[in-house]
């Protein structure tokens, strides 16, 4: 399940039990991406706060646009865990006539994306693969696609969150599977 010791739900007490209750799934299970933080409940809380701020708080970017960034970054980083979770979440957010976009983007196919969406995924790609190569012209390209500076900030925040989450998952060995709740659902808090 992980490369380091984790504390399972039934052995959690105090701060950790409260964090598991707060951030766990409706069935009482806790996703492995969170359980890898179990030795440091403050780290789990910080991860969740960053996730909620980046992905669920009000933003001029839609939730689907932010999930597209997450799917793109996770695919580029080779993080199957986050790729599967967030492609499922994206699929739930898209209207019926665009549901296929989630699986296409998961495979790296951006043909179903709008110009605006492609500008977001292009920015996320460059920020993931070559962060020091991002220049004013990249920002100008996003502006020409109709994005304003707040949207660009939120795109950078979403891409940066996934860079962090992917490294936690990959670096600590969180795996999809046993103990996982339903994927792609929103947090309770």
Residue spans for each PLM region:
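Hydrophobic alpha-helical segments
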Residues: 1-189
């Amino acid at each position: 399940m992980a490369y380091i010791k984790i504390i399972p739900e039934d052995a959690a007490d105090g701060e950790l039990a409260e964090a598991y209750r707060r951030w766990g799934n409706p069935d009482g299970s806790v996703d492995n991406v969170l359980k890898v933080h179990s030795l440091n409940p403050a780290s789990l809380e910080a991860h969740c706060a960053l996730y909620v701020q980046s992905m669920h708080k009000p933003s001029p970017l839609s939730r689907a646009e932010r999930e597209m960034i997450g799917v793109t970054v996770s695919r580029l980083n080779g993080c199957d865990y986050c790729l599967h979770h967030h492609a499922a979440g994206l699929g739930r957010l898209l209207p019926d006539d665009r549901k296929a976009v989630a699986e296409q983007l998961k495979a790296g196919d951006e043909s179903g994306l709008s110009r605006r969406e492609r500008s977001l995924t292009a920015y996320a790609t460059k920020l993931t693969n070559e962060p020091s190569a991002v220049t004013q012209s990249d920002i100008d390209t996003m502006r020409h696609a109709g994005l304003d500076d707040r949207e660009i900030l939120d795109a950078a925040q979403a891409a940066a969150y996934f860079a962090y989450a992917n490294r936690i998952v990959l670096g600590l060995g969180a795996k999809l599977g046993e103990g996982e709740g339903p994927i792609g659902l929103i947090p309770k808090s």
